[in-house]
Amino acid sequence: MTTREYDYIICGAGSAGNVLATRLTEDPDVTVLLLEAGGPDYRFDFRTQMPAALAYPLQGRRYNWAYETDPEPHMDNRRMECGRGKGLGGSSLINGMCYIRGNALDYDNWSTHKGLENWTYLDCLPYFKKAETRDVGPNDYHGGSGPVSVTTSKPGVNPLFEAMVDAGVQAGYPRTDDLNGYQQEGFGPMDRTVTPKGRRASTARGYLDQAKARPNLEIVTHALADRILFDGKRASGVTYLRGSERATAHARREVLVCSGAIASPQLLQRSGVGPGAWLKALDIPVVLDLPGVGQNLQDHLEMYIQYECKEPVSLYPALKWWNQPKIGLEWMLNGTGLGASNHFEAGGFIRTRDDDPWPNIQYHFLPVAINYNGSNAIEMHGFQAHVGSMRSPSRGRVKLRSRDPNDHPSILFNYMAEALDWREFRDAIRATREIMRQPALDRYRGRELNPGADCKTDKELDAFVRARAETAFHPSCSCKMGYDDMAVVDEEGRVHGLDGLRVVDASIMPIITTGNLNAPTIMIAEKIADKIRGRTPLARVDVPYFVANGAPARNVAKAVRQPETV
């Protein structure tokens, strides 16, 4: 068994861990060990590097932990997918590359929690900007020199994108030019983590590429963290497995857990930090009975509302194997063409009720009818909207099954456990149908494929959701920040009741954000990195941002085609 010593040990080279490894080693006298259970982000592997190939990593286990939930009691007892990234880049290596920061009011709401006063939107915005290089240039809301390449959709990519945005506006919802700028609410182009050369902009590419040659950073892949070591109440190191070999590394300063919303609570529990009764049931010595570890688990659930396309403008031909070599060759040689896009180039956020303070529904528009993981492709030209609610009141948990680090934990999101969940999904389906029936889509819109035009009553819509809704792959909040009885970490990611131990990833969100989670996770890591380094936080900015303040969610009077009566 080998033993070495570092200032910091980071468990997990994902969206947060790579940020910390890069920022901490900017100080040349600081040594960092970065442990990653997966392998390298092989740059020759089109499955992770080609944006259009985003479904492929979810279909195997080289890059995907392929977790599965326990039977979900409100979803026909289905065991549902819970894909998580494995390899340098973590989930930024296999995600959909949608760059969505969340709504300003998400962070303002966090800041109302005791101890989180410095997590307002205006406190967080400088760190979003620090991380970003946006292809159309910086402004008050966007960065121009950060590690993460962000590409903004341009007009003319596919007529369906513009038609779907126009349809949203014709239905009475706002148009927004920037879902990450002044106003998230509305429909518009979607930013994506794609490089100017058409490659996936994972945090391995953006952050580790600039840091991996530093002599004070050691990156160890295929290293599965087994447990955190403690000297009394202080984290002192980590034991990890590389194949059949066990190694131990000691931390002079801190152990930083960045393993994600599933594996971070799993590692803490395996190390003796978590609900005492759970640990004792597995004969794990209790270092600290911390009841919130693994609780408060949240996710986004979504549906695919699919339509036949009457004109041959969808991506359907690109799904055929005989067309894919040409697409792949153009992407490989030039970084252009269909392979260079994730094809989530338009979307939006709406409120379904006037009393919703900020958007509760997200849309991703896609010019093909297919499941996110590449399954169940409709054999015809089609298009779809991915539609889901943003802040479900339902809460789940991550619970250790055994002491074996190779065993997956018990995961229960408890999807659709509350009455509000059902109301929001019914509202979302009906709102989507109103959008899809607007004149902008008349030339393209054929019959409704899913749920199908005959699916109308509350009971029928609920049955569709139970049978067909899927995860958006946004697990979070299972080691939440705060100071209540179920909080796990403080506002700087430090685990309550212990020294030398932090959690820094999407698990520390107190409440899930409105949209995709990669951008907020990077921001969280950038912000806490300054705290770890003892640096003065970036100054709070002063820019305006949209607040509805009770304004109508939809201007029905301006809708080109009025709502149907059911």
Curated annotation (Swiss-Prot):
Binding residues for FAD: 7-36
Region (Disordered) residue spans: 180-201
Under PROSITE patterns, the record lists: GMC_OXRED_1 (PS00623), GMC_OXRED_2 (PS00624)
**GO molecular function: any one?**
flavin adenine dinucleotide binding
Q: Mention one GO biological process in which this protein takes part, according to its record.
A: glycine betaine biosynthetic process from choline
The UniProt catalytic activity note for this protein reads: choline + A = betaine aldehyde + AH2; betaine aldehyde + NAD(+) + H2O = glycine betaine + NADH + 2 H(+)
Q: Which cofactor does it need?
A: FAD
- Keyword line: FAD, Flavoprotein, NAD, Oxidoreductase
User: Which family does the record assign?
Assistant: Belongs to the GMC oxidoreductase family.
HAMAP family attached to this UniProt entry: Choline_dehydrogen (MF_00750)
Record-given protein name: Oxygen-dependent choline dehydrogenase
> Which organism is this entry from?
Burkholderia cenocepacia (strain ATCC BAA-245 / DSM 16553 / LMG 16656 / NCTC 13227 / J2315 / CF5610)
